[in-house]
Amino acid sequence: MKIHEYQGKEIFRKYGVPTPKGILAVSANDAEAAAKELGTSVVVVKAQIHAGGRGKGGGVKLAKSPAEAKELAKQMLGMKLKTIQTGPEGQTVHKVYIEEGLAIGQELYLGVTLDRATSRITFMASREGGVEIEEVAEKHPEKILRESVDPAVGFQDFQGRKLAFGLGLTGPTVNKFTQFCSALYRMFMDTDASLVEINPLVILKDGGVVALDAKVTFDENALYRHKDLLEYRDLAEEEPREIQAKEWDLAYIALDGNIGCMVNGAGLAMATMDTIKLVGGSPANFLDVGGGANKEKVTAAFKLILADPAVKAVLVNIFGGIMKCDVIAEGIIAAAKEVQLKVPLVVRLEGTNVEKGKELLSNSGLAITPADNLRQAAEKAVAAVK
């Protein structure tokens, strides 16, 4: 689950992670009032969306007066902000964060994430703060420092000092940076976060260390034990179909292709998408119906796929283990009739009750294209949209 910058900073402050003073605004008048309340000669007007790279997209602006803050907020609110992380469609700005200006001496990058290669929480830091870290990682990977945390002992002060020295920090700032990292680690662990990024992390001219940004993502599988964090969820920032999928306990992620996919099992779903790409197509979604789906769940999954106007064909790829192929077939037939299917449908079934499932599809009277294997199914789906 992603949250907004202002929400991330609220959590930071609870753990003693230094942040600038800021006030949320949902209108231009609110922005003007916030700038007056902060009382600094310069304020920063920041668009609040669930994506990074806002600065380059025009979502972070300096204002030297409350009137200017009002005008900038007026321009941002309601705009479609496009960044490297939003895709070409962009995201609508519904709120802005008005923050005090600071005397910045240096901009750095600091991130905490789960490193699957080491199975450990890992700190990443770079002197290249304030720019796209993805670009730095691609062009200059040597500029990113990494420090893995032993789960048995947690984050140690020497690791903070090691990162600080690698970033070129000196004097009292080294200890301030170390304390900053320790507090961030506690927050990461306590909230079951999966990613925390601060870009930029700034060193003030007086040597202070402050989080000028906050990008926080939580592990959705752990939210059952963090009811307080659910209050931060902003459904307006999430894909409507993904919200609907959660209601049916479906794993659904919208993509930008035109071939809808319904598969059971995450591994098979990824293999299906890879095969579609391999034969020249583009998947419209990732959708795993799980191993114990019933007819109603399959119907809901089918309707979810077809709710995407970009879908020009549907590929169903099911290996029936726990899930029986005849149950899948019944769900496909029910959904196709209910939504009045108008796009080509390719179905590949294998496993438990496969012959019964194929018989149901064959006798359904629907225009269903059968396939005997994954590659053949992908080729038929791609051919159907060309």
UniProtKB/Swiss-Prot annotation:
Record's catalysed reaction(s): succinate + ATP + CoA = succinyl-CoA + ADP + phosphate; GTP + succinate + CoA = succinyl-CoA + GDP + phosphate
Binding of substrate, residues: N264, G321, I322, M323
Keywords from the UniProt entry: ATP-binding, Ligase, Magnesium, Metal-binding, Nucleotide-binding, Tricarboxylic acid cycle
Residues that bind ATP: K46, G53, R54, G55, E99, L102, E107
Record domain ATP-grasp: where: 9-244
Record keyword ATP-binding present: yes
InterPro entries: ATP-grasp (IPR011761), ATP-grasp_succ-CoA_synth-type (IPR013650), ATP_grasp_subdomain_1 (IPR013815), Succ-CoA_synthase_bsu_CS (IPR017866), SUCC_ACL_C (IPR005811), Succ_CoA_ligase-like_bsu (IPR005809), Succinyl-CoA_synth-like (IPR016102)
General function of this protein: Succinyl-CoA synthetase functions in the citric acid cycle (TCA), coupling the hydrolysis of succinyl-CoA to the synthesis of either ATP or GTP and thus represents the only step of substrate-level phosphorylation in the TCA. The beta subunit provides nucleotide specificity of the enzyme and binds the substrate succinate, while the binding sites for coenzyme A and phosphate are found in the alpha subunit.
Family: Belongs to the succinate/malate CoA ligase beta subunit family.
Name of the protein in question: Succinate--CoA ligase [ADP-forming] subunit beta
Lineage: Bacteria, Pseudomonadati, Myxococcota, Myxococcia, Myxococcales
